[in-house]
C-alpha cells in the first residue's frame, strides 16, 4: 500500500464538515491510518510550505493555514497520491468537478478545503513533517 498526506484546512474545521470530507476519503477506498488535529504556528506553516515561499500567495496561504486548527492525516491505499489528488479536485473550486471534495465543499481558491501530497517522494517528506513512525498504524 502507498501513502499520502492529507490536510483538512481551517475552513473544513470551522464549517464542521470534517466527517463529510472523511466520508469521501473512505468511500474512495483510502484508509485513514493516522490523524491528529493541531493549530499550526507561523513557523510550522512557513516551513511546510517553503516550496511556495517566492510565490505571490505565500503570505496569504500561511495566514490562512494558521488562522484555525487543521487536521493532518496519513492516507493509505493503492496509488494513494494519485487517487487522493483526483478526489480533491482542481485547486480552484470553480473548475473542480462535482463529486470531488473541492467541487462539492470548497468556497474559494483560498479556502479550498484540503491539501494533498503531489508525489510519492513529497508524501514521505510531508508525512515525516507531522508524524513519527509510532503514530502511523497500518491495517
Swiss-Prot record:
Its EC number is 2.7.4.6. It holds the Pfam family NDK. It catalyses: a 2'-deoxyribonucleoside 5'-diphosphate + ATP = a 2'-deoxyribonucleoside 5'-triphosphate + ADP; a ribonucleoside 5'-diphosphate + ATP = a ribonucleoside 5'-triphosphate + ADP. It comes from the Bacteria. HAMAP family: NDP_kinase (MF_00451). InterPro entries: NDK-like_dom, NDK-like_dom_sf, Nucleoside_diP_kinase, Nucleoside_diP_kinase_AS. Keywords: ATP-binding, Cytoplasm, Kinase, Magnesium, Metal-binding, Nucleotide metabolism, Nucleotide-binding, Phosphoprotein, Transferase. This is Nucleoside diphosphate kinase.
Amino acid at each position: 500500500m502507498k501513502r499520502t498526506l492529507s490536510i483538512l484546512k481551517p475552513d473544513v474545521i470551522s464549517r464542521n464538515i470534517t466527517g463529510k470530507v472523511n466520508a469521501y476519503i473512505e468511500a474512495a477506498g483510502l484508509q485513514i491510518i493516522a490523524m491528529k488535529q493541531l493549530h499550526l504556528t507561523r513557523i510550522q506553516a512557513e516551513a511546510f510550505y517553503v516550496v511556495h515561499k517566492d510565490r505571490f500567495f505565500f503570505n496569504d496561504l500561511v495566514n490562512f493555514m494558521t488562522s484555525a486548527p487543521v487536521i493532518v492525516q496519513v492516507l493509505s491505499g493503492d496509488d494513494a497520491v494519485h487517487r487522493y489528488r483526483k478526489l480533491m479536485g482542481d485547486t480552484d473550486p470553480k473548475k473542480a468537478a462535482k463529486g470531488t471534495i473541492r467541487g462539492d465543499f470548497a468556497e474559494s481558491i483560498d479556502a479550498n478545503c484540503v491539501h494533498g501530497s503531489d508525489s510519492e517522494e513529497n508524501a514521505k517528506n510531508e508525512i515525516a513533517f507531522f508524524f513519527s513512525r509510532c503514530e502511523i498504524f497500518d491495517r
